[in-house]
Amino acid sequence: NISADWPQPDTQEGISIVDLTNYPLDNPGTVTVSRQDVMLGGLLLVNEWHSRPSDFDESSLVSIMTYARSMGVTKSIWRNSDQRLFPVAANALLDALNAAKEAGLEGYVVREAYRSISDQQTLWDAEYNRLKGRHSAWTDDELIAATKKSINLPGTSEYNSGLAFTLYLYENGNDELNKMVFSESEQGKWMYENSWKYGLVFRFPLQDFPTKGTVSRAYKTGVNVEMNLFRFVGIPNATVMHHLDMCLEEYIEYLMAHPHIAVFEDGQLKYEIVRQQVGDDSSTFSVSISRKTSNYTMSLDNMGGLITIYEY
């Protein structure tokens, strides 16, 4: 699958990323894609500066409880039966928890998952009004700035993506486990180190959080609060983000600067990732693809781009 004129990976061991920005797609073709079909591919950026698209469709969300039970999970990994995620994220969560269980680690529970815009508005209003009651002299701008420190404006929270969730530890009657701080527990450490293998990334790195030596990305993510929040991006993207130590904002910027990359593992081509600018205005668009493999997925990034991930 490797083109003769491609640069060679710099190592035959582990992950190696080759920049193919100046190399065309092999065996090129074109497909027509609908926005809705690629909205939830995993790379939709939702943050303080990039609000969830107005045509976002939440109809395929599933109850974590119902989904987990349908997959044979008997242990309660949900805090309540109302918690929802999109199936791709729920699946990645279950895969990660199964792997943790095989490593002897259990007790993970989802603290929070999808929030609708109206749920987010309710939380926003409550915090805004609480602050207003305590600081009657503050201007509206001051109140908004203060509210933003703990609650995102509706549409700008990662919880509004349906691809993210927070975790904590709880087992009925297990006082020792229930007292544990997630980030200091073996369960937490395992999840931080291994979640990328299942397509999940730790979303909001801060200085020395979740682990010592972590460099803060708050200036990129806009979030400066310690949260054990994991976000589904898909295994190929999580692999690159882990290897390059990038948050989601940095990864999308990286693909804007390097819109065609190949990812090798132990010298073998594993993924090819291509970003094309398609804009946010069309409900369908024409996309260039490589017909070298039919095994590919696509995702909008909410920055006007469409990212195609080929798996070999």
Can you annotate each of these PLM segments?
Residues 1-312:
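Extracytoplasmic cell-surface/polysaccharide-interacting catalytic and binding patches
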